[in-house]
Amino acid sequence: AIMAGLVGSEMCIRDRLFSPSKVVATAKHFIGDGGTTDGIDQGNTEVSEQELRDIHGQGYMSAIESGVQTIMATFNSWNGSKVHGNNYLLNEVLKEQMGFEGFVIGDWTGHGQVNGCNDEQCAKAINAGVDMIMVPFAWKAFFENTVNQVENGEIAITRINDAVKRILRVKARSGIIGGDLPSERQYSNQTNFLGSETHRLVAREAVRKSLVLLKNKNSILPLKRNQRILVTGPAANSIGQQSGGWTITWQGTGNSNADFPNGTSVYDGISQVVSDGGGTIILSTDGTYSGSRPDAAIVVYGETPYAEGAGDLSSLEYQSGSKTDLNILKSLKDQGIPIISIFLSGRPLWVNAEINASDAFIAAWLPGSEGIGIADVIFTNNEETVNYDFSGKLSFSWPNTPT
């Protein structure tokens, strides 16, 4: 679906693949980066070819059928062989067997990890089928070395011609060749589309549909809007945390809510819904509150943002050291307050203790800028009937042990 949205449905028009409102999409990272041993970033995927195809390759088949024009090679290895230098996977499997006509792009200096290569030269990656090398720093040396490698026969000129043909084909299909200047294209400088209401409504819908209800003791959800609700937890009012890594910055850290104009935190969304329903909202990061006891506590917590190797784990246990979030849950539970856990994460984690301490537990993943999408589901409408029901399903198993 996302591929169709990016490239459109004009797949049969070979001389002009995309309409002016569409873009060239990239599928990545080919192949097996989600199956490395122990989940280590840029690690080694130790599986059979059948498992590699059946589990890690299916998404690429669908992407190719839907018109993806570029595919990025992965940093990881397959059974010890770096994919950037794997002729069988890139040339024979991807281009020949899977029929990929676009071009393969390397990842950030990924070629430098291939045996016998470095950041400044890698004939092996080019010969293996990488058509466009990503060289952020040593590009002048890489260019000169590649020319020399063609001249001395390390790289066949037919391989260069194939790479150039593939790149030009994508440019032609996207209308770049012979088309308008970038500054003259239909949507040039149309910044009003960024963060537009229409786009945000789609994002809000995506949040609603991706929520997975893992526990709902005594059918506590959905909550009525006219209650006294405590919203607490370290992520309750943090759009940055609910957006994760690769958000504004590489690691997604150091962001404040002010960096997300018009975005809504989980608290913002709940506050809007509860206030509209005649209820009372209390915000607290540590579970404390003043006044009468809340009718329910919504505790928002989870992973802090990370990207790439910074997210590597030695255990799947959430907060394997200090259980600060679990302590909040236990404190509220001891007071007899019903607890709804909103768990933010980019992956399944072992949270048995947190689930057991909660009356309801929701895997909310990373809802991004539209925290209000969570409130749409966990509260009734003004008629006190279901507003939006939970529809999200786990597409993979949830860990039963921390190892």
Label every model-predicted segment.
Residues 1-10:
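Positively charged, low-complexity/disordered segments
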Residues 9-403:
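Glycoside hydrolase catalytic-domain context in secreted enzymes
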